[in-house]
Amino acid sequence: MDKILNLGRWIFPLSFLLYVGLHLGKPEVGASFVPVFLPFPLFWNYLTAALILAFIISAVSARYDKLAYALMALYVCLMALLVHLPRALSDMHGAGMMTAAAAKEQELEMINVFRNIMLAGALLAFARFVAKDRRIIG
């Protein structure tokens, strides 16, 4: 059973490859999530892909993995607060008039908020109980 449970150390960080693929495969979609107050949305999309890839490499290689898990937790919390929550709470068409598609989009954004909060918890748990390299943040 321990051998199966130990697979989580690999499966969890490698699952983030999906996000790298989404950022690189459909950059215009990733760029559409960049808040309007940030210039150059495609730059932020590609930078995000590179940083997620750096997280994966760090987590899998167990080099600076505690720091990587903690920083990734910070990133997903910031995404929840700065991207998904404002989109979930926005009145897209003003005066309470909302199409079914807009209501569905807001619902999905709220699901993204909850998903990011759960993911941040998992990342922090991995930083505390799974990470091996404690050079930077003990």
Locate predicted features:
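Extended, low-polarity transmembrane helix blocks
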Residues: 1-28, 42-54, 60-138
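Membrane-interface helix-loop junction between the first two transmembrane segments
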Residues: 25-37
